[in-house]
Design a protein with these regions (language model features):
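A short beta-loop-alpha structural element at the N-terminal edge
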Residues: 9-23
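Conserved acetyl-CoA pyrophosphate-binding loop and the N-cap/start of the following alpha-helix
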Residues: 87, 91-99
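Conserved GNAT acetyl-CoA-binding A-motif
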Residues: 104-116
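A short helix-loop-beta-strand connector motif used in the catalytic cores of GNAT acetyltransferases and
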Residues: 45-56, 77
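Conserved beta-strand-loop-alpha-helix junction that forms the acyl-donor binding cleft
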Residues: 114-123, 141-145
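A conserved beta-turn-beta hairpin within the catalytic core of GNAT-like acetyltransferases
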Residues: 70-79, 88, 134-135
Length: 151
C-alpha cells in the first residue's frame, strides 16, 4: 500500500528577491492592479521602507496569497490582499490577514485600516467576517504629478 506524500506546508514570510513576477501575476489575476499604479514600483517602494513589507503565503513553492502592509507610526494599512481564485474559501485570506495584523502588532501599531472599492461586496463580507467594521469616513485624493482624476 502506497502512502500519500504529506501536503506541502503553508508558509507566510516577507517577500524576497524571487517571486516578484508571480506576485504581480496573482494581483492581476485577482483584479487588483490598476493602469495608474505600477505594481512593480509599489513592490520596490514597499521593500525599501522599514515600516512596510509584503507578506507572501506559499503552498510548497506556489504563491497563493499576499498582503502589502505598512504603517505611519500610528495606524497600519493593508493593500493588495490577494488569494489565488482557485484556492479561495480555504482560510488563506484569513491567514494572510492574521499575519498582517501580527506584523503590525509587533511594530507597536494598535489599529489597522484598509480600503475596499464600494462595488466589491464579496470582499466587504469577508472583512466583516474577520472582525472589521465599516468606518464613517470620506476619502479624498489628489494626484500630485498633474495626472487626471482616476476612479
Amino acid at each position: 500500500m502506497a502512502l500519500a506524500a504529506p501536503a506541502p506546508a503553508l508558509t507566510i514570510a516577507p517577500i524576497g528577491d524571487g517571486g516578484i513576477a508571480d506576485v504581480i501575476a496573482l494581483w492581476q489575476r485577482c483584479g487588483l492592479t490598476r493602469p495608474w499604479n505600477d505594481p512593480a514600483a509599489d513592490i520596490a517602494l514597499t521593500r525599501r521602507g522599514a515600516n512596510s513589507t509584503i507578506l507572501i503565503s506559499r503552498d510548497g513553492g506556489a504563491i497563493i496569497a499576499t498582503a502589502m502592509v505598512g504603517h505611519d507610526g500610528h495606524r497600519g494599512w493593508v493593500y493588495y490582499v490577494a488569494v489565488d481564485p482557485d484556492r479561495r474559501g480555504k482560510g488563506h485570506g484569513r491567514a494572510i490577514m492574521n499575519a498582517a495584523e501580527e506584523w503590525l502588532r509587533q511594530a507597536g501599531i494598535a489599529k489597522m485600516q484598509l480600503m475596499v472599492r464600494s462595488d466589491n461586496t464579496r470582499v466587504q463580507a469577508f472583512y466583516e467576517s474577520i472582525g472589521y467594521d465599516e468606518q464613517e469616513r470620506i476619502l479624498y485624493a489628489k494626484w500630485l504629478d498633474g495626472r487626471e482624476r482616476t476612479p
